A protein has these predicted regions:
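Phosphate-binding site of ATP-dependent enzymes
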Residues: 129-212
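C-terminal active-site "lid" helix and adjoining low-complexity regulatory extension at the edge
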Residues: 214, 223-271
C-alpha cells in the first residue's frame, strides 16, 4: 500500500510540472514508482501520467508482478504498449530463449552434474543460488539453469539492454565482485549495443523481445566466456535504474531512451 501511495504522489508531482492540456500516457493497473526510468523518459517527452485508460490516448500495461491477468488487462485499449507481455516468469524466458536462439538456458537438475543455478520462478525475487547437481528433487516454484561463466578479471560481468519499439536503445555493462553472482552491482557503465553485441546477436535479441511481446523494457544478458554465446536470463517490463550507474551518465542514457520510446507513440501522433 505504501508503495502505491508513493507512486500516486510521484505522479501528482510530475503532472504538476506540466500543463493540464499536455498529452497523457495512461499506466494500468499500477502507476510507476519514482525510481523508474520511465519518469525520465516521459519528462523529456512532455507526457503526463494518467491512470484512466481510454481509446485515443496512449496507454501502457504497467504491472511489476510476474503475470498480468486478463482481468487486470481488461481496461486497457487494444493498442496499449506491452499489452501482450503478460508473462515474464523465468520459465517463460527460458522457453522463449531456446525457441529463438536454438540453444537452451534451462537444465534438468535431476540429471545435470556439476554446478547449476536455481532461482525463483517469479520476477524480482532475487533468491538465486548455485547448487551442485544432480539434485534429488525439484523445488516447486523454482527454475534451474546452466551456470553461465561470465567472470572477467575476477569480476562478474553482466549486461542489461533497453528495448523500445523493436529498437535496442542503450546497454549497460555491470560489474560486481565474485562470489556475488546474484546481486550487489558496484558499477554500471553505459554502452552502445554495438560495443557489446554483434549485428547477429542484436538481431537475436530483437527477435527475443518480439517473441516476449516486450514493446518496452529491459533484458539481462550474460555472455559465456568459454563459448562466447549469449543468454537472456531475465526480461522486465517495468525497469528500474541499475545500481552503480553514475549520476553524470543519467542525462545521456535517458536522452537515448526517450528518443527510442518515441517509436511507441507514433500511432497517436506524439513522436
Amino acid at each position: 500500500v505504501r508503495r502505491r501511495i508513493a507512486a500516486s504522489r510521484s505522479a501528482a508531482r510530475h503532472n504538476a510540472r506540466l500543463s493540464t492540456d499536455a498529452p497523457t500516457l495512461n499506466f494500468w493497473p499500477m502507476r510507476p514508482f519514482p525510481i523508474a526510468p520511465i519518469y525520465h523518459i516521459i519528462s523529456r517527452l512532455g507526457l503526463r501520467v494518467g491512470h484512466e485508460p481510454r481509446d485515443g490516448q496512449p496507454a501502457i500495461a504497467w504491472e511489476t508482478g510476474t503475470w498480468v491477468t486478463s482481468r487486470q488487462a481488461a481496461p486497457l485499449p487494444h493498442d496499449a504498449i506491452n499489452l501482450q507481455c503478460v508473462d515474464i516468469s523465468k520459465s517463460k524466458v527460458e522457453r522463449t530463449w531456446e525457441e529463438v536462439a536454438g540453444y537452451p538456458l534451462a537444465v534438468d537438475p535431476l540429471t545435470t552434474a556439476g554446478r547449476l543455478v536455481a532461482k525463483p520462478e517469479e520476477n524480482a525475487r532475487h533468491g538465486g543460488r548455485i547448487l551442485s547437481g544432480p539434485l534429488k528433487r525439484r523445488r516447486k516454484g523454482w527454475v534451474y539453469e546452466r551456470l553461465v561463466d561470465c567472470l572477467v578479471d575476477g569480476q562478474i560481468c553482466t549486461m542489461r539492454l533497453m528495448t523500445a519499439g523493436g529498437h535496442l536503445a542503450v546497454a549497460y555493462e555491470k560489474f560486481r565482485p565474485e562470489p556475488q553472482w546474484f546481486g550487489g552491482t558496484r558499477l554500471a557503465i553505459p554502452r552502445t549495443p554495438d560495443q557489446l553485441f554483434s549485428a547477429q546477436e542484436q538481431g537475436l535479441l530483437r527477435r527475443f523481445a518480439a517473441a516476449m511481446h516486450l514493446d518496452y523494457g529491459e533484458m539481462d544478458v550474460l555472455r559465456d566466456q568459454s563459448t562466447g554465446l549469449i543468454y537472456v536470463v531475465d526480461a522486465n517490463r517495468t525497469p528500474t535504474r541499475p545500481p552503480g550507474l553514475a549520476e553524470k551518465d543519467w542525462a545521456s542514457v535517458y536522452d537515448l531512451q526517450a528518443e527510442a520510446f518515441k517509436a511507441l507513440l507514433q500511432p497517436w501522433g506524439l513522436a
